[in-house]
């Protein structure tokens, strides 16, 4: 039987963004760990390095490493869980691993690992640096679609839904807009890059003009904070668009917000979310013509729209719940049996 575990969670909690990213996946994972009864201590690495500037310590890397060492010595964790921690070097991780041999090391990594996608070499390098030292690794892409990971220590996790954050039930009411679309050029940047274009813009430009849209991140800036949820809450349907070519199971973390708040969600079939959801819970499409046809079908059948959105909402809250995902991370890391098994856990 698994006892309560002391976990040092080193991940960006976005304090410097003043609430703009209060619904981040890192926060949802953290909430799940606490709700599961674990003793969790946080280091928000990018906030630490942002607050302490020193011309003799570029990027405040030495300062961050010393903070981590002090926290380990005082807290004595059973497990260290890393998020996107990019200010530590190979030698830093090597020292941690050699110095604290009894501590389990794990990482979660949510960015795309798509060869024909954005920042592939950079993201691969960021992931692999920690991968070398971690007992377990958790990614939002199917390990079977990536050729440089060991499937015995690398596992898929979906983007988490947190019922304390994803509180809306859009499937129960009528809305001002038909379709919600939100994209960005990076959550840390927050605003659009000038003259930037990618596959998502091409898809948006080819969408049917017979429905009304609530779109952010194309001609206007992305929407963040509570405004994101207020705009989402004006819509009955949403299209989940991620950068790069489709790869098995990968999605931006908006997928959790769309399903988790009761929108009828469209996603390309090459992401294989039909492995998790039936056609009565989510809508997959083959190409832009198929997508446009299905958008019009559900716009003209509100009863069916709400039924599928409701089913998707219930299923997503059941299988993508942050408590479930956080429990999976801990159990896999310590080699405990996973009790509640769902379709995504087989990857």
Predicted regions: what they are:
Residues 2-55, 67, 75, 84-91, ...:
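Nucleotide-sugar donor-binding catalytic core of glycosyltransferases
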């Amino acid at each position: 039987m698994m006892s309560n575990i002391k976990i040092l969670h080193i991940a960006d909690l976005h304090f410097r963004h003043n609430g703009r990213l209060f619904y981040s996946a890192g926060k949802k994972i953290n909430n799940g760990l606490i709700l599961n009864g674990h003793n969790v201590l946080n280091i928000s690495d990018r906030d630490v390095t942002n607050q302490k500037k020193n011309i003799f310590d570029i990027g405040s890397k030495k300062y961050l490493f010393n903070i981590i060492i002090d926290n380990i010595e005082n807290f004595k964790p059973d497990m260290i869980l890393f998020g996107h921690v990019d200010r530590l070097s190979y030698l830093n991780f090597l020292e941690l691993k050699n110095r604290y041999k009894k501590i389990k090391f794990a990482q979660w990594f949510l960015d795309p690992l798509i060869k024909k996608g954005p920042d592939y070499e950079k993201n691969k390098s960021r992931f692999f640096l920690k991968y070398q030292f971690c007992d377990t690794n958790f990614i939002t892409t199917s390990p079977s679609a990536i050729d440089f990971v060991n499937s015995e220590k690398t596992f898929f996790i979906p983007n988490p839904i947190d019922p304390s954050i994803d509180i809306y039930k859009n499937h129960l009411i009528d809305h001002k807009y038909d379709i919600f679309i939100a994209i960005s050029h990076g959550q840390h940047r927050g605003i659009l890059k000038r003259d930037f274009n990618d596959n998502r813009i091409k898809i948006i430009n080819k969408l049917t003009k017979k429905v009304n849209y609530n779109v952010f991140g194309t001609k206007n800036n992305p929407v963040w904070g509570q405004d994101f949820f207020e705009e989402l809450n004006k819509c009955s349907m949403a299209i989940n668009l991620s950068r790069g070519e489709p790869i098995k199971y990968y999605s931006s973390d908006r997928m959790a917000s769309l399903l988790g708040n009761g929108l009828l969600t469209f996603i390309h079939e090459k992401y294989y979310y039909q492995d998790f959801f039936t056609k009565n819970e989510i809508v997959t499409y083959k190409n832009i013509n198929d997508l446009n046809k299905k958008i019009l079908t559900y716009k003209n059948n509100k009863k069916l729209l709400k039924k599928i959105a409701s089913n998707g909402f219930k299923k997503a809250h059941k299988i993508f719940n942050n408590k479930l995902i956080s429990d999976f991370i801990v159990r896999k890391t310590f080699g405990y049996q996973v009790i509640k098994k769902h379709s995504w856990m087989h990857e």
